[in-house]
Amino acid sequence: RVRSSAASVVYKRQELTEGVCGDRIPTFFMRGNHEIRNAYSIGLRDHYDYVGDRTYGSFNWGDTRIVMLDCGEDKPDDHWVYYGLNDFTQLRNEQVDFLKKELSSKEFKKAGKRVLIHHIPLYGNDGKNLCANLWTKLLEKAPFNISLNAHTHKYAYHPKGELGNNYPVIIGGGYKMDGATVMILEKKKDELRVKVLNAKGKILLDITV
């Protein structure tokens, strides 16, 4: 969660990026619902250069297309805890148009591999995703090689077709060390290798997509 000051955000960002050599290797931030909460959450935008100045977007890394979606909060906008201040319905609707354009774009169609990233899973979350009615139809035939998700705080792997998903789905683990995971994607020539490790370095998953 985003605490009360810029200093706390800078400290946390440093803590999270040092381990992946964020001073030398480009690091991309994808927010989840907890990064939307607390006093300084709006200040996060001052610390990151968002692609297209939006919290969702797409870009190429070599011949791999990365598509990032922002699910917003995990509760409806009219939930009492938000005091009428949220409008994530509009944000999700915006991304319907974005997805339609992205999936038909030359950059997407010509990509060697395609990676989808969003915080709240469309599959493997008991249907509790406010984006599902808007995005699932668009994505169910999209030729993604892998989808990377989080939110449930429990690692899971769903092979293509297991839950009606048209691509493999990996859900990252929790924030406590005994359930934490790291996902590593490595592209070599025509192969995209995906590994999931736990905090002890044990390989939980090693697949090529």
Predicted regions located by residue number:
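Single conserved hydrophobic/aromatic residue that forms the stacking wall/gate
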Residues: 1-7, 11
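Local beta-strand N-terminus motif with an aromatic residue
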Residues: 7, 111-113, 144
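Active-site glycine-centered loops adjacent to acidic/histidine catalytic or metal-binding residues
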Residues: 8, 32-33, 119, 150-151
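Extended active-site neighborhood of metal-dependent phosphoesterases/phosphodiesterases
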Residues: 12-104, 134-146, 156-175, 179-188
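Structural motif
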Residues: 66-68, 113-117, 148
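Short acidic, glycine-rich surface-loop motifs adjacent to enzyme active sites
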Residues: 105-125
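Active-site His/acidic residue clusters
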Residues: 126-131
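A short C-terminal boundary segment appended to hydrolase-like catalytic domains
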Residues: 186-209
